[in-house]
Amino acid sequence: MIIYVDIDGTICTITDGQYSDAVPLPSRIEKINKLYDEGNKIVYWTARGSQTGIDWREITKKQLNEWGAKHHELSLNKPHYDLYVDDKTINSYDYFKD
């Protein structure tokens, strides 16, 4: 299975564009790492820089590595939007409920 996972507000805190200040959410990272360990392809997908044009790739890669977030790919091409409607989405709050 190929699983796309958002970063901000999903595996770390939301920082309103101050991405260097993001704090990891370890229990959420562990849950995604389990999916990785089970053989799923994990792609972290973020809209960092989509409005400003700033390239956050290196900082984001460093954060994922420091946080121990296992993944196969990092994609920074997620568009900025206010609402996402899709037949395959899962709300992160529902997904990470214990």
Go through the PLM ranges and name each one.
Residues 1-98:
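Catalytic phosphate/metal-binding cores of nucleic-acid and nucleotide-processing enzymes, i.e., regions
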